[in-house]
């Protein structure tokens, strides 16, 4: 089974079909399967509250990953900060679409066991 859902995409220019294709391609590259992946785009306030509640960080972040899988099967919820997504895209001179793909990829890599501190 392969379920990929998106909620509150930050722009209508984003193609859900294209993002799903990117996610499937990334999973295939790492030779893992997708069981269920939910990507939620949330506002600045919601992200700060979640970061405080779940990580005890009193700062903003661009993505939180809740992994329920086993590094071979992706079963996760990603929470992407719409605010940070827009900010990052401007600061890095990228389109919003590219930044969305980067952040989703970042979250998926967390489900595969990569951490922000990994040298790879």
Model region roles, listed by residue range:
Residues 1-101, 109-120:
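An acidic/histidine-cluster motif and surrounding catalytic segment
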